[in-house]
Amino acid sequence: MFDLTGKHVCYVADCGGIALETSKVLMTKNIAKLAILQSTENPQAIAQLQSIKPSTQIFFWTYDVTMAREEMKKYFDEVMVQMDYIDVLINGATLCDENNIDATINTNLTGMMNTVATVLPYMDRQMGGSGGLIVNVTSVIGLDPSPVFCAYSASKFGVIGFTRSLADPLYYSQNGVAVMAVCCGPTRVFVDRELKAFLEYGQSFADRLRRAPCQSTSVCGQNIVNAIERSENGQIWIADKGGLELVKLHWYWHMADQFLHYMQSNDEEDQE
């Protein structure tokens, strides 16, 4: 179990929908500090969060997840002045715009990766940090493909690949930073938007999705926090239909074990 009591949490996302509901649950867990970095100001949401737990310090920065890493560094230098340290980094910025592939990939994948690369040195035990947990909030169509939202699905597959790679013991044994992902199923805030399919052939499906049964954002937010509390390094969870399910990870490349053994053997030889 991962105990959130007294933790310093940094949430990179829009403070609305799933992120807001997740933050509400976090505020009930006696966290000490919450930093919110998002693209637009939302003082009403911040006030709502503060009313849940007045003793928890909340900080806010306007943040563009697609900015250059050098600019991100400037932001997180300021974040660290207020936060002192980060125990939990949650990446939840998301965009589904099949007509703008670059923006979709940059928001969902590249921006998340750059944010992680920027924050990791502050958390890394080898660099003076205390370790911690990185949580990547992604989608179930990062596990199974979507013929309708092809660009969005590709970006979410990338999140899963990045999460599993960064969670490898090669890193975790050194930096003490666990990495996990939560894949959200269809959620009301998502399907209520006007959604465009990657190709016109899929538009009728995209239109029908708005009438499909979906979980509420509040239930999804609760299960994201539940997954955090139950997390172990490298785990992938599905938060869908009001439930929480641990993904059974599978290796498809039959050479994976041999290749890893080869790399480890060469590393040992280099140290001799």
Swiss-Prot record:
Domain of life of the source: Eukaryota
InterPro entries associated with the record: ADH-rel (IPR002427), NAD(P)-bd_dom_sf (IPR036291), Sc_DH/Rdtase_CS (IPR020904), SDR_fam (IPR002347)
Residues where NAD(+) binds: 11-34
A Gene Ontology molecular function term of the record: oxidoreductase activity
The entry's keywords: Oxidoreductase
PROSITE patterns xref list: ADH_SHORT (PS00061)
Active site positions, chain numbering: Y152 (proton acceptor)
Binding positions (substrate): S139
SUPFAM superfamilies attached to this UniProt entry: NAD(P)-binding Rossmann-fold domains
GO cellular component: cytoplasm
The UniProt record lists the keyword Repeat: no
Family per similarity comment: Belongs to the short-chain dehydrogenases/reductases (SDR) family.
Protein name as it appears in the record: Alcohol dehydrogenase-related 31 kDa protein
Natural source organism: Drosophila teissieri
Gene responsible for this protein: Adhr
